[in-house]
Amino acid sequence: MKGPPTFCSLLLLSLLLSPDPTAAFLLPPSTACCTQLYRKPLSDKLLRKVIQVELQEADGDCHLQAFVLHLAQRSICIHPQNPSLSQWFEHQERKLHGTLPKLNFGMLRKMG
């Protein structure tokens, strides 16, 4: 019965000594990438359900640039040049601009 406790001890030791906890595992963490992009106009009903928006870059992990709209139950990958998404972003900017007058949206675009 020395085998399993020794393995567990070594695994625990590698977790404790590693500066990155995920580095102790043999398999890298998987990342979810958009593989298909929605290009059709987006409904107002769908856009009202958006909780968070994330930009997926076309880099080493993912090969498509997309906006990921996170809803309560799912996420949708949207083409970056979708006109209805652009209009929604402008509407959100105007809405936020009314509540946060000192926020510089031009600077946010440069950072994003």
UniProtKB/Swiss-Prot annotation:
Monomer, dimer, and tetramer. Heparin avidly promotes oligomerization. Interacts with TNFAIP6 (via Link domain). It is found in: Secreted. Disulfide bonds join 33-62, 34-77. GO terms for molecular function: CCR3 chemokine receptor binding; chemokine activity; CXCR chemokine receptor binding. It comes from Homo sapiens (Human). The keyword Transmembrane helix does not apply. Chemotactic factor that attracts skin-associated memory T-lymphocytes. May play a role in mediating homing of lymphocytes to cutaneous sites. Binds to CCR10. GO terms for biological process: antimicrobial humoral immune response mediated by antimicrobial peptide; cell-cell signaling; cellular response to lipopolysaccharide; chemotaxis; immune response; inflammatory response; neutrophil chemotaxis. Residues 1-24 form the signal peptide. One of its GO terms (cellular component) is extracellular space. Belongs to the intercrine beta (chemokine CC) family. InterPro entries: Chemokine_IL8-like_dom (IPR001811), Interleukin_8-like_sf (IPR036048). This is C-C motif chemokine 27.
